[in-house]
């Protein structure tokens, strides 16, 4: 029996530190345990928001070029799908003011469509579950596509002697 009550956390901190780490399965679980004990602010955070706009599926076969993105954390008016010649760009931007501060989420995904895609038949659809689908039917054998993702949008520079780009906003 102790002279004064000691809580479980203080008792663990007074024990041998290596034995305490072994109890939590080395450093992997210790990190989770420490974040729960020492950083209560992060405990209440919605960690599903960390991978916003990262889940995507791309299909490029001899029938179609298709992209499917999970954008469930964005409202329809916060999304923009744009086609510049054969360059497909999907952008999402959200700004939210909370009681603890200001949150800004943004993503940009770009793909170069294959040469045999019918650009006039490109179709976009956003369902009720937050899945954005973009399809472009192909006429013949497909070529490899190029993809890139950026965390912020790039500014366009004006270069002389370049023909104007055929820009179409497919979804906004």
Curated annotation (Swiss-Prot):
Task: Select a single GO molecular function from the record's annotations and give it.
Answer: unfolded protein binding
Organism from which the protein derives: Nippostrongylus brasiliensis
Key words, A-Z: Stress response
Query: Could you give a single Gene Ontology term from the biological process aspect?
Result: protein refolding
What family does the Swiss-Prot or TrEMBL record give for this protein? Belongs to the small heat shock protein (HSP20) family.
Which gene holds the coding sequence for this protein? HSP20
**A GO CC annotation given for this chain:** nucleus
Q: What is this protein called?
A: Heat shock protein homolog
Query: Region Disordered: which residues?
Result: 135-172
Q: Which SUPFAM superfamilies match?
A: HSP20-like chaperones
Outline the extent of the sHSP domain.
47-153
